[in-house]
Regions:
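Vicinal oxygen chelate
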Residues: 1-2, 30, 50-128
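Core segments of cupin and vicinal oxygen chelate
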Residues: 1-43
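Short secondary-structure boundary/capping segments
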Residues: 19, 27-28, 52-55, 95-96
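N-terminal beta-strand motif that seeds the catalytic metal site of vicinal oxygen chelate
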Residues: 1-6, 62-63, 67, 118-128
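A generic structural signal for short beta-strands and their flanking turns/coil linkers
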Residues: 25-27, 34, 59-61, 82-84
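A generic structural signal for short
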Residues: 14, 63-64, 95
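A short local loop/turn or secondary-structure capping micro-motif enriched for an aromatic residue
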Residues: 37-38, 44-48, 121-125
Length: 128
């Protein structure tokens, strides 16, 4: 990120993450029970590429987290209340197949894609 204060505000205020350790060069967040580290870097001028997944254009530069269905629905409601733009609207992907999941994508202020998903069956998380 090219602005750590903007990152801190966005991840805490929009997503509800809590702060961990921080310096003038990086910030740790509690990202839904996982450590997310945002580092200070010069403004990125790279084009963000996409690939098709189940008919949707997905940012090739993204990361994600698996939530329970209840957590996923609460986060969808929180983001809708904050009028956050979804890059991929909340939906069900791979319906009726192994890996069926509720998913949506958003971007942070630096165009990093974030995917949030909840699987219909947790045994399918890494099935092929």
């Amino acid at each position: 990120a090219s602005n750590l204060n903007l990152s801190k505000n966005w991840y805490c205020s929009i997503l509800g993450c809590s702060l961990g350790r921080q310096t003038v060069e990086w910030i740790d967040f509690n990202f839904f029970g996982h450590q997310l580290v945002v580092h200070l870097v010069p403004a990125n001028e790279e084009k963000v590429f996409t690939n098709r997944v189940d008919g949707e254009k997905v940012s090739s530069r993204h990361f994600g987290v698996i939530l329970t269905h209840n957590e996923w629905k609460k986060l969808v409601n929180r983001l809708q209340e904050k009028n956050l733009k979804f890059t991929i609207q909340p939906q069900t992907r791979f319906s009726g197949k192994a890996g069926e999941q509720s998913t949506f994508f958003i971007e942070d202020p630096f165009e990093n894609g974030l995917e949030f998903k909840a699987f219909q069956n947790d045994d399918d998380i890494f099935s092929v």
